[in-house]
Amino acid sequence: METIPALRPFVQQPTVRLTTYRRDGRPVGTAVSIAVDGRRAYVRTFESAGKFKRIRHNPLVEVAPSTLRGEATGPAIRARVRVLAGDEAERARRLIVRKHPLLHGVLVPLGHRLTGKKTVHLELTPLEGADGRSDTRERAAA
């Protein structure tokens, strides 16, 4: 499946800054690993993570290429998050493990098991047309 333009910057990107929003609207950015498949991107976290709690309250997020520390290195796109279950979650897990075999094939699952944390898989769907950019000035310049 061909990758849509909004997600192309993330295909080779190992880490992105996922910005979620507190109830009062303040943004919180977190570095997460990402995998892209066509029209969707996938990330994982654990069920008790702050970002997951914020996503359950507000599924609108921003995603930007970033360093491993979560410092944005490119423009953000807006996206809607959906929590996956069953076969969809398994498919997302496989895509993430394929892109990040050591980190998400061994280390993250081991860490979640040792701490008793439940892993959740999330699907990100870009908003705002083909480019998904969050800043109208960025869209005008493109």
Where are these regions (language model features)?
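Short, structured beta-strand-loop surface elements
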Residues: S48-E128
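Short linear motifs at secondary-structure transitions and domain/linker junctions
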Residues: L7-V11, V16-T20, V36-R40, K51-N58, ...
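Short beta-strand segments
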Residues: Q13-E47, V61-P65, G74-I77
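Extreme N-terminal tail/first-helix region
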Residues: M1-R17, E71-T73, T136-A142
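A generic local structural motif
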Residues: E2-P5, V28-T30, S48-G50, V108-P109
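Residue-level signal for secondary-structure boundary sites
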Residues: Y42, D87, A130-G132
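Short, charged, intrinsically disordered terminal tails
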Residues: T125, G129-A140
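Generic signature of intrinsically disordered, low-complexity, basic-rich segments
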Residues: A31, E88, T136-E138
